[in-house]
């Protein structure tokens, strides 16, 4: 099996995390997984949604979108169509669920964190790149809140999280699929994990023949290997 990119089966794409990419948001990152590029921002606002009023905890919610020409052919903006597509809703819910799992909401205080992930160039793995980059932006946003005198109850961050894709390509488990691999993969998995080694979410679909338990285990093992490398890259970015 030869991957289109020439990478080894267990090799990530080149990953770059650039912090403070925009000047207005409390946390902002440009994350690059190969040719996939996503701007992730975290904005802080006082108050919480109505369903959390008086409960003494904060909230985090996420939105996701793709620029019209982030792909090979131009896609119409969802705003001009008047509604978000099912894929967009699914991805932004995944991002929100994943990042909430990193926080102790009771320590956040009466604030809402708005996470925005905007894909400026797509070459596979946009949702996993979004989660990985937004996590770093979230850490920076929490630091800003603390500097402003917030987080009196302590640091709400429980652990780092990151995400990566794995799949079965030409009968072999491969890590971090790009678009060419993703479009031809027999199976595609998106895995979200904590830095402590726990799983937050595993999304998997067989595109053709069902995958076998041994395939699933091989993909999970690759995801864990890749995730360890991604967590190191997050820490390097945060130390910069």
Curated annotation (Swiss-Prot):
GO biological process: rRNA catabolic process; rRNA processing; tRNA processing
Record-listed E.C. numbers: 2.7.7.56
GO molecular function terms listed in the Swiss-Prot or TrEMBL record: 3'-5'-RNA exonuclease activity; tRNA binding; tRNA nucleotidyltransferase activity
Source taxon at top rank: Bacteria
Catalytic activity of the protein: tRNA(n+1) + phosphate = tRNA(n) + a ribonucleoside 5'-diphosphate
Pfam families with a match to the protein in the record: RNase_PH (PF01138), RNase_PH_C (PF03725)
UniProt entry keywords in alphabetical sequence: Nucleotidyltransferase, RNA-binding, rRNA processing, Transferase, tRNA processing, tRNA-binding
Keyword Plastid: no
Entry function: Phosphorolytic 3'-5' exoribonuclease that plays an important role in tRNA 3'-end maturation. Removes nucleotide residues following the 3'-CCA terminus of tRNAs; can also add nucleotides to the ends of RNA molecules by using nucleoside diphosphates as substrates, but this may not be physiologically important. Probably plays a role in initiation of 16S rRNA degradation (leading to ribosome degradation) during starvation.
Family: Belongs to the RNase PH family.
HAMAP family: RNase_PH
Subunit: Homohexameric ring arranged as a trimer of dimers.
NCBIfam families in the cross-refs: RNasePH
Protein name (Swiss-Prot/TrEMBL): Ribonuclease PH
Organism: Pseudomonas putida (strain W619)
Lineage of origin: Bacteria, Pseudomonadati, Pseudomonadota, Gammaproteobacteria, Pseudomonadales
């Amino acid at each position: 099996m030869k991957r289109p990119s020439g990478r080894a089966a267990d090799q990530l794409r080149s990953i770059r995390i650039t912090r403070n990419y925009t000047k207005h948001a409390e946390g902002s990152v440009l994350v690059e997984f190969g040719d996939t590029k996503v701007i992730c921002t975290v904005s802080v606002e006082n108050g919480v949604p109505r369903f959390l009023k008086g409960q003494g905890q904060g909230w985090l919610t996420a939105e996701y979108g793709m620029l019209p020409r982030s792909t090979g052919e131009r896609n119409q903006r969802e705003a001009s169509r008047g509604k978000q597509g099912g894929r967009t809703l699914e991805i932004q819910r995944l991002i929100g669920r994943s990042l909430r799992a990193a926080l102790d909401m009771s320590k956040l205080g009466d604030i809402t964190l708005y996470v925005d992930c905007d894909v400026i160039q797509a070459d596979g793995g946009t949702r996993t790149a979004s989660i990985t980059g937004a996590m770093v932006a979230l850490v920076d946003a929490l630091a800003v809140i603390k500097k402003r005198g917030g987080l009196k109850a302590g640091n709400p961050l429980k652990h780092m999280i990151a995400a990566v894709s794995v799949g079965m390509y030409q009968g072999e488990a491969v890590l971090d699929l790009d678009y060419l691999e993703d479009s031809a993969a027999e199976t595609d998995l998106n895995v979200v994990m904590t830095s402590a080694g726990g799983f937050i979410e595993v999304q998997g679909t067989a595109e053709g023949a069902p995958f076998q338990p041994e395939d699933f285990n091989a993909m999970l093992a690759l995801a864990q290997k890749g995730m360890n490398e991604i967590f190191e890259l997050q820490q390097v970015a945060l130390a910069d």
